[in-house]
Amino acid sequence: MRFKKCLTALIVLSSVFMTFADEEERVLRLKIGDKNLKDKTMEVSADTIYSAEKGQPIPFADMIQEMAASRFIYVGETHNSFPMHQIQAKIISALYEQDRNLSVGLEMYPVTCQEILNRWSLGILPECEFIRTGHWYVNWNYNFGYYQKIFQFAKEKSLPMYGLNAPRDLISQIRMKGWEALSGEEKEMVPQPDLSHQEHRSLIRTIFESTHLPPQMKGRGLEMAFEGLYRAQSAWDETMAFYALKALEKEDGKMVVLAGSGHLLYNLGLNRRAFEKSRLPFKTVVCVAIPKDKQTIEVSRSLADYVWGIPEEEKPVFPSVGLSFKKINGLENLVVDKKPVDGVAKDGNFEKGDVVLSVDGKAFNDINELRIYLAHFNWEDEAKFLVLRDAEEIQVALKFVAEKNEKEKP
């Protein structure tokens, strides 16, 4: 994890990539959460599911059976971990066989995009049109290929899918100025987040402090950054809990909620908030990646109801570009929003304010369209940008080369 700006850290926190640098490993062994389990630990190995209650391995079928009485099943993810999304798809499929009255809640989409999700579940849209009209690459920063199996299953079985998130600009306002700064209409969309839960605050602070911070963030600036981050993280959790409950009012069965693990750890995030409001039973599954040089890692038994160990990947299946773009009034071309600090673009010659004239000879004036184009590149490919910088046209090569032991890069 790393911290460049509060919003960047917020994106990182929403997924919490479960690999085990020393400064991050302690996140998994905190004595918080379930009072009966928080002082106990268990050793987790790859390709094995563990029951926190029992402190030992559990067969997949038994785990699914134990979920029968739950109304919410929360399955955490690292957004660019293909194995974790395969696990999500497997759980959804098994729960569907158990009870076909099933729906899926998504961190990936804001509630304002519900109509496009309805059309997808009804089988009206082909995939390419869904990605385009649903603005997948504007709402979400990750390759649709990670989620393809999940979405295709939902479409085939006509499973209702619900966007649970708030529009990003509202979360940014809360981060900078607090919930009170929202308009009356905006407050109706984003419920006021409870900031008083000390164990949740301790969890987010531990994740925050495990991030490599630049020197200028030390001292008073560090505390201000954390408070803004915590407001935003809490608002995200509160909003997703609110809309998950609202969606389930329309459904008689259970809902599988797919969200970054940072929203679910120790059952203190959106899962806790939804339970406190409804008392509806739930289960949480969190995956942890086991490094190649370790047989097991030690985690707190209060981390989640089920902990699923998976082998650490050498690199993500799909390259992360790391470029953000914006539109400027009066200019048709897209503009590089900030100098890239991660993804394959980090090592390219891109600068904030570069005007994108073309990519591989093609002009783009829509952010989603450019991201759709870039999403088709594989490792070792190369895209050629022509940008305008200081009134000079410059060729910039975007090389899709993985770093050694590349971790998640939002």
Mark where each language-model region is:
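PDZ-domain C-terminal substructure recognizer with occasional recognition of PDZ-binding tails
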Residues: 351, 357, 372-410
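Zymogen propeptides
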Residues: 55-96
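Hydrophobic h-region of N-terminal signal peptides that target proteins for export
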Residues: 12-19
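Membrane-embedded segments
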Residues: 79-105, 111-122
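N- or domain-start disorder-to-order transition segments that initiate the globular core
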Residues: 20-70
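A substrate-binding/cap region within the structured catalytic cores of diverse enzymes
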Residues: 98, 102-103, 115-245, 249
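PDZ/PDZ-like peptide-tail recognition elements
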Residues: 297-341, 376, 395-410
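Conserved PDZ fold ligand-binding element
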Residues: 345-367
